[in-house]
Amino acid sequence: MSMYERCQKVMPAVANRATTLGVVDGEGCYVITEDGRKVLDFASGVAVNNLGFKNPEVVQAIREQLDTMIHVGHNVVYNESYVKLAEKLVELTGGDTKVYFSNSGAEANDGAMKLAKYVTKRPGIIAFRNSFHGRTIGSLSITGSNSGYRKYYEPLMPAVYWADYNDLEQFDAIFEKLIAPECVAAIIVEPVQGEGGYVVPKPEFLKGLRKICDDHGIMLI
């Protein structure tokens, strides 16, 4: 019985998969299936793990970490890997910032919206059509790429307003007709829209969003 057939018996059909392949090994950009085939993975992994399979540097780093500790609660003690990564991210992003780690992008987005509302004391969030930010109730509320994600779960988080990606001129109308800028806690945007079609914005778009947010005391996520 294949992995796919076994999964049908014990796992609910809550997440679709692109194939029915069961894989047992991988190397570089290839995976080895349970029936011995070598299949090219054009993504070389997925999401934050698109580094290929068994990358020697990644494997060595994992081994070194296993030799010290597998996991420790960051809300209990500090550890070198946690602090070192935070320092590196601060360095790469200009130095005048701080870092907090989350389990997933959806949780990071939920946390960012909570923080923006807490700091600004404002209710509104502006998101972009065709965006994807996650499947929690909070991140689903700002996801505009597929109505199927939202089906059966509404009402979602209130005070979410939609804008078109790659368009700065619309914001005068949004602030005049939909929500005043002093009521907007944050604008959340993908630097490159993924599910919207891998849309790379015009160079001036993100800079323009930054200026709009700075001018009105809005957080940019």
Model-derived segments and spans:
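Glycine-rich loop-to-alpha-helix module at the N-terminal edge of alpha/beta enzyme cores
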Residues: K9, K38-R122, I126
